[in-house]
Regions:
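Mid-domain Rossmann-like dinucleotide-binding core that forms the NAD(H)/NADP(H) cofactor-binding site
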Residues: 51-131
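C-terminal substrate-binding/catalytic core of Rossmann-like NAD(P)-dependent dehydrogenases/reductases
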Residues: 174-217
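Short, intrinsically disordered, charge-balanced linker/junction segments flanking boundaries
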Residues: 3-6, 120, 213-217
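Glycine-rich phosphate/adenylate-binding loop and adjacent beta-alpha elements
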Residues: 1-46
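A general structural signal for well-ordered alpha-helical segments in protein cores
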Residues: 65, 139, 155, 203-207
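Glycine-rich cofactor phosphate-binding loops and adjacent beta1-alpha1 units
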Residues: 74-80, 101-106, 118-191
Length: 217
């Protein structure tokens, strides 16, 4: 687990280790895993049994998706008929896969721009090119997985089409400040949550998910 919370961090509370002040992330502003000798506490290691090594290599990435799913479950109201994953990249693919598993009674929708990548989301219930969605298109909650220069456009479209009192989990990273239509956010009573990186519980959830043959195949 690359995330290292401070020694005084108390596990099992309402606070997440990946946001606590004083923590750090190995290989991002701190010495990481390319050193000749890597020394880490035992609680920074999560064991797996049957996951193929080439799949286990993306455990940290999957754990980020698990964390986003957890945040959504905490803040989203009980009407979860239609959940959208906005984006067509690798993060969107992981989050959509997890959402399909974690929200079995929901219609999982993917909206993106890249036609070739969108074809890979064959497991999703609905897949749309963002340029083709109609004014009547709606959903209850959203995962934003775009990031970069496309973040502003993604936020604008999500705000336009989401139903009132929906939750938006922001997962895409932009290096630039992104303006938001606060008037419509307030008018619709939307809940916005930032989700970044992950902790031990998320790694354990990722391993549990990836141990299943139908997932890692």
């Amino acid at each position: 687990i690359p995330n290292q919370p401070p020694k005084e961090f108390e596990e099992g509370t309402e606070f997440y280790e990946n946001y606590v002040t004083g923590g750090y992330f190995r290989s991002s502003g701190h010495d990481g895993f390319m050193r000749e000798f890597v020394t880490i506490p035992k609680n920074r290691v999560v064991k797996y049994e049957t996951i193929p090594s080439k799949v286990a290599a993306i455990t940290e990435f999957v754990s980020v998706g698990i964390h986003g799913i957890t945040r959504m479950k905490q803040v989203a109201h009980s009407r979860r008929n239609r959940i959208v994953v906005w984006g067509s990249g690798s993060l969107a693919y992981v989050v959509a896969t997890l959402a399909k598993e974690k929200f079995p009674n929901s219609t999982i929708i993917v909206v993106g721009k890249n036609h070739d990548k969108l074809r890979l989301f064959s497991f999703a219930d609905e897949v749309y090119d963002v340029s083709e969605i109609e004014d009547g298109f709606t959903f209850d909650h959203a995962f934003e997985c775009v990031g970069g220069t496309g973040t502003q456009e993604a936020y604008r479209d999500i705000i336009k089409h989401i139903k009132p009192q929906g939750a938006v989990v922001m997962m895409g990273v932009s290096e630039f400040e992104v303006p938001l239509n606060t008037r419509d956010i307030l008018e619709k009573g939307l809940t916005w949550v930032g989700s970044s990186r992950s902790g031990r519980e998320d790694f354990e959830g990722a391993v549990q998910m990836m141990e299943r043959p139908q997932v890692h195949s």
